[in-house]
From Swiss-Prot:
It is an enzyme of class 1 (oxidoreductase). Its EC number is 1.97.1.12. It comes from the Eukaryota. [4Fe-4S] cluster 2 binds at residues 21, 48, 51, 54. GO terms for biological process: photosynthetic electron transport in photosystem I. It is a peripheral membrane protein. This is Photosystem I iron-sulfur center. The keyword 4Fe-4S applies. Binds 2 [4Fe-4S] clusters. Cluster 2 is most probably the spectroscopically characterized electron acceptor FA and cluster 1 is most probably FB. Residues 2-31, 39-68 form the 4Fe-4S ferredoxin-type domain. Pfam families: Fer4_7. Apoprotein for the two 4Fe-4S centers FA and FB of photosystem I (PSI); essential for photochemical activity. FB is the terminal electron acceptor of PSI, donating electrons to ferredoxin. The C-terminus interacts with PsaA/B/D and helps assemble the protein into the PSI complex. Required for binding of PsaD and PsaE to PSI. PSI is a plastocyanin-ferredoxin oxidoreductase, converting photonic excitation into a charge separation, which transfers an electron from the donor P700 chlorophyll pair to the spectroscopically characterized acceptors A0, A1, FX, FA and FB in turn.
Length: 81
């Protein structure tokens, strides 16, 4: 699958998205931009299955982590209706 995972600077460093990801796409890295001194990172986006559990787990209401599904997934979702 070809999905894009974006982490935004609204991340509060809580690790909820990292713990929610079933395929270990996300990890925490050092960052001085928030109190937690860490931010989520997505070094393994090729393993993303598009489940969006990271988005659901994020306490900032999807403002910090977003999964953009690839065209093949979006197309198959439309066909299932």
């Amino acid at each position: 699958m070809s999905h894009s995972v974006k982490i935004y600077d609204t991340c509060i460093g809580c690790t909820q998205c990292v713990r929610a990801c079933p395929t270990d796409v996300l990890e925490m890295i050092p960052w001085d931009g928030c109190k937690a001194k860490q931010i989520a990172s997505a070094p393994r986006t090729e393993d993303c299955v598009g489940c969006k559990r990271c988005e659901s787990a994020c306490p900032t209401d999807f403002l910090s982590v977003r999964v953009y599904l690839g065209p093949e997934t979006t197309r198959s979702m439309a066909l299932s209706y």
